[in-house]
Amino acid sequence: MEIFPAIDLKEGRCVRLYQGEFSKETVMNEDPVAQAIIFEKLGAEILHIVDLDGAIAGESLNFLVIEKICKAVRIPVQVGGGIRSLKAVEKLLSVGVEKVILGTAALYDKSFLEEAVHLYKEKIIVGIDAKNGFVATRGWLDLSEISYISLAKQMESLGVQTIVFTDISKDGTLAGPNFEQLTLLQKSVGIRLIASGGVASIQDVKKLNDMNIYGVIIGKALYEKKIDLEEVLQVTKLC
């Protein structure tokens, strides 16, 4: 199982939100580059970065920070948030980003998604963020009428190989992942699933591992030391 330490960027800082609400932010580190280096030194094998400002604006507003992180660490970096054109995808890949996560664009611009998947194959990941079972977009501000299961099936049919699934109600709560929704998703599609939102303990990670979930994104639990990164990496290697 892959462990993805999370770095959420807002106004150039590393922050955490509560249930996706931008008014409920906590600054975890004023220097995201330093935070990335910390995670790498603790043994992280890949980083998950979200440009929160970009998710709302529809374009990367923390690009320079992302570029600095890519230059500062030797491990792969995957990035999401506001990536809605091929030019934006290419720009990120050109500075060393390993994989790009498309969210809003996956729902509203299928032709762009298809072209991106055709050109970049497994480097394109789709992020499905759900609230009460329905897909949320534009930085979680808009709620669509499409279920997360329906969108996941569409993405699989278009050749997407990996999905990041986030239950917004769990994000930043340390209340545990939404195992029920993840189980339904797993039964509905046959592609890689990365779980995000609510992970609070090594027990949560073990349960996801037992479910054969491909990866898990961990944010608040690492920053608040509910989970020790070195320990969870060791545990997942032994499983």
UniProtKB/Swiss-Prot annotation:
Q: Which residues form the active site?
A: 8, 129
Q: Which EC class is this protein assigned?
A: isomerase
Enzyme Commission (EC) number: 5.3.1.16
GO BP: L-histidine biosynthetic process; L-tryptophan biosynthetic process
A GO term from the CC aspect: cytoplasm
Tell me where it mainly resides.
cytoplasm
Catalytic reaction(s) noted: 1-(5-phospho-beta-D-ribosyl)-5-[(5-phospho-beta-D-ribosylamino)methylideneamino]imidazole-4-carboxamide = 5-[(5-phospho-1-deoxy-D-ribulos-1-ylimino)methylamino]-1-(5-phospho-beta-D-ribosyl)imidazole-4-carboxamide
Q: Fetch the PANTHER family from UniProt.
A: 1-(5-PHOSPHORIBOSYL)-5-[(5-PHOSPHORIBOSYLAMINO)METHYLIDENEAMINO] IMIDAZOLE-4-CARBOXAMIDE ISOMERASE
The record ties this protein, via NCBIfam families, to: 1-(5-phosphoribosyl)-5-[(5-phosphoribosylamino)methylideneamino]imidazole-4-carboxamide isomerase (TIGR00007)
Task: Tell me what this protein is called.
Answer: 1-(5-phosphoribosyl)-5-[(5-phosphoribosylamino)methylideneamino] imidazole-4-carboxamide isomerase
Task: Name the source organism.
Answer: Bacillus cereus (strain G9842)
